[in-house]
């Protein structure tokens, strides 16, 4: 229902509405459940893989991932980059201003399935119950304290 309404509204009304609604006491996850606020679409496996492929192609590291560390600023609703990086024998450090990544492991399992179908070797996360379990399996980091997190990024 909200999606149909959102499509019909001019862009400027959406901005005004978001500014007004952001002042309410609801958390980001509450707004996300209502489909009113979302930090991108990286929870969608196909979309996440497409974005990753675009970025690594533009960066020139497409063919040489081994041992690389990928830094993602503002991963939004997902830690998908960590899983995709590990599938390419690399690791990822994700930095955001808050813990916005979905705790639901199903999108991450679906991503691993897609990566496997593409001939990659995704990390084993079938027994993972938390984001920490997934990050551990991927040798990844998810830093969620904004500018303070930069001090924790190893060079």
Task: Give the role of each language-model region.
Residues 79-86, 104-106, 154:
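A short acidic (Asp/Glu
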């Amino acid at each position: 229902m909200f999606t149909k309404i959102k499509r019909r509204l001019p862009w400027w009304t959406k901005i005004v509405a978001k500014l007004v609604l952001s002042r309410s006491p609801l958390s980001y996850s509450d707004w996300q459940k209502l489909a009113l606020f979302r930090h991108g679409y990286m929870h969608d496996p196909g979309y996440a893989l497409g974005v990753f492929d675009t970025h690594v192609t533009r960066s020139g590291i497409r063919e040489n991932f081994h041992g690389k560390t990928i830094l993602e600023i503002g991963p939004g609703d997902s830690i998908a980059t960590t899983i995709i990086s590990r599938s390419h024998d690399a690791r990822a450090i994700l930095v955001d201003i808050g813990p916005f990544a979905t705790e639901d492991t199903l999108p991450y399992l679906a991503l691993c399935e897609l990566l496997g179908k593409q001939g990659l070797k995704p990390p084993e996360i079938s027994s993972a119950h938390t984001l920490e379990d997934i990050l551990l399996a991927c040798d990844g980091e998810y830093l969620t304290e904004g500018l303070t997190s930069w001090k924790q990024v190893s060079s």
